């Protein structure tokens, strides 16, 4: 039986990439009975019925899946933020980082529009980049005008399924065009406003870029922390995890507990204060969330 990855789903057909060829496949009837929907990104076993067609027989276990966009087995999220226009937002970046890490997806931070950074903004921007690198995140500085960082970003895509995410206007389309010029995506084509009614499923496709597969639809269009419990939130702040062993209380949430090593690290400047402030704002958001029944 042949194996491959679903790179596109459209009108009941699934397009499976296998050894450089694409097969147009249908799912077995048993999937419908079991209410299983094959997703873009699924690793599947299929039976070829001709040179170009086949039937999906089995879907391998998924590492993860996203609801919006509907895609499975995402390995990394390219979080695109602009240094300016719109201004760099640590709160939004930290929100993305929490969501991405909660799905066991590797985040890669891209700071775009570095060519627009002036002398006034430069020291602040450089400090942010240093901070996130020190925490352990991969940070790539890019510019689609000077082509800064484009080759470096390409090397990160190889062999992985990636989604691009980030607010509107940060240059996601321009960046994808720089990575693969023949795409010619219109700027703002990759819309961040995907929710057009509850039951609308946006067509998703994986594009081959730099030896990897990249979703043509932005990931994490819904930014609510709905699936994250208060107790797990500190786990998505790596610099908190490093120090939580030294907290007096096991399961310390680093809010108001005595002898908290994380708060001490914030006070002594070892953890950036904005990271802690963002954490506390997420704590409040989760606490205020209405219980689901």
Swiss-Prot record:
It comes from the Bacteria. Transmembrane segments: none annotated. It is an enzyme of class 3 (hydrolase). Its EC number is 3.6.1.-. Binds 1 zinc ion per subunit. Residues 63-223 form the CP-type G domain. Monomer. Associates with 30S ribosomal subunit, binds 16S rRNA. One of several proteins that assist in the late maturation steps of the functional core of the 30S ribosomal subunit. Helps release RbfA from mature subunits. May play a role in the assembly of ribosomal proteins into the subunit. Circularly permuted GTPase that catalyzes slow GTP hydrolysis, GTPase activity is stimulated by the 30S ribosomal subunit. This is Small ribosomal subunit biogenesis GTPase RsgA. It comes from Geobacillus sp. (strain WCH70).
